Amino acid sequence: MLTCNDCSTWEQFVNYIKTRCSKTAFENWIAPIQVLEESSEKIRLEIPNIFVQSYLLDNYKKDLCSFVPLDAEGNPALEFVVAEIKRSSPLVTPSIAKPATEVSEENKDFQLKLNGAYRFDNFIEGPSNQFVKSAALGIAARPGRSYNPLFIHGGVGLGKTHLLHAVGHYVREHHKNLRIHCITTEAFINDLVHHLRVKSIDKMKNFYRSLDLLLVDDIQFLQNRQNFEEEFCNTFETLIHLSKQIVVTSDKPPGQLKLSERIIARMEWGLVAHVGVPDLETRVAILQHKAEQKGLNIPNEIAFYIADHVYGNVRQLEGAINKLTAYCLLFNKPLTETTVRDTLKELFRAPSKQKVSVESILKSVATVFQVKIQDLKGSSRAKNVPLARQVAMYLAKTLITDSLVAIGAAFGKTHSTVLYACKTIEQKIEKDALLKNQISLCKNNIAIDSPQHFV
């Protein structure tokens, strides 16, 4: 296959990679790439976004050098065109600031209190978080020059804070002269209250507005705090105007937060990325990684057994490993399925009597597609809403035993509209890898609310 004379250079590379990566990775990152022009000196490719370019070069640069033409420096001679804007972006290695020998005196106040365990190299990737990790790595390499702000949202314990701190570590190590601050929303509010009390609000404003990178965790705690929201929004706008990078995390997408339209619009300026519930294979990888850190040898079959029963979030998986490690060491017990079952019986989810509901489907779809639940039930034709509404109907027909008439009534539509939506989505997922992945994320989120249905 690799020596087929009828295959172009790019096709040979694609055929080679297809046998060496997962089906999901191939469909999400390689399949969407289109060849615009190919010659013996250069290949011009169309990509859906800049993160596909980063993923391709970060993971397959060595393989690319074996197939595609090379430039004078020995790098793949590729030129990328982002599909959305049709603007050529010649391949250039990101210019990383050279590490300074020491941090200057004026920057010592900006030293970070980051979790040393939260780095990119120990963040376990899977279909549910591959895009958001690539996005975070992309903005860390080029702060203020990619998507700004980066808004990361997802449920509890899925890795949002890990990625936030990973950005901080990466920028601190590669851009040592940049001023960085990582803070929770509650800490920001407390900081503001303190400076108001001692009448030094200008000092606080000067501090935040002199930053090069602001990392804010749990922005949802800004809800229903209008005065604090206004000050945060002013700081936010100032930094964006100065091309300073901002990364924000939340448990909900911007449109679902009870914040002013002004700040929601600012949050949606850049890139909104969702961290989904990890699938089975990713949970197994997380378990094995955590076990290795604890010095616990966990066989594959045991890892799969645990992952099949503990699937809410990463923190629960880590808790399972901690408990198993302690039990095996204290009682000198071997790690068997019986040991796991006895030790983790409180963590294992009891069979749920709850069925999948239209509301749980709407909640999941709204989160993944970044739309409002009320829009899914209405007739809005705003961006992303019609497709998201069809996906919700498709999932309802797939996961709920109700009649098409009943499902249609839940959406305020007729049964024929539901049927049309289902047929449309079925056709699209055959060709659209991104949509297929989004639907998979929706199902994973729904499974957390209605686990028994997915057993």
UniProtKB/Swiss-Prot annotation:
Ranges where the record places region Domain IV, binds dsDNA: 329-455
Region of interest (Domain II), residue spans: 96-112
Organism of this sequence: Chlamydia trachomatis serovar D (strain ATCC VR-885 / DSM 19411 / UW-3/Cx)
Entry's family note: Belongs to the DnaA family.
The protein's name in its UniProt record: Chromosomal replication initiator protein DnaA 2
SMART domains named in the record: AAA, Bac_DnaA_C
Function: Plays an essential role in the initiation and regulation of chromosomal replication. ATP-DnaA binds to the origin of replication (oriC) to initiate formation of the DNA replication initiation complex once per cell cycle. Binds the DnaA box (a 9 base pair repeat at the origin) and separates the double-stranded (ds)DNA. Forms a right-handed helical filament on oriC DNA; dsDNA binds to the exterior of the filament while single-stranded (ss)DNA is stabiized in the filament's interior.
Location of the region described as Domain I, interacts with DnaA modulators in the Swiss-Prot/TrEMBL record: 1-95
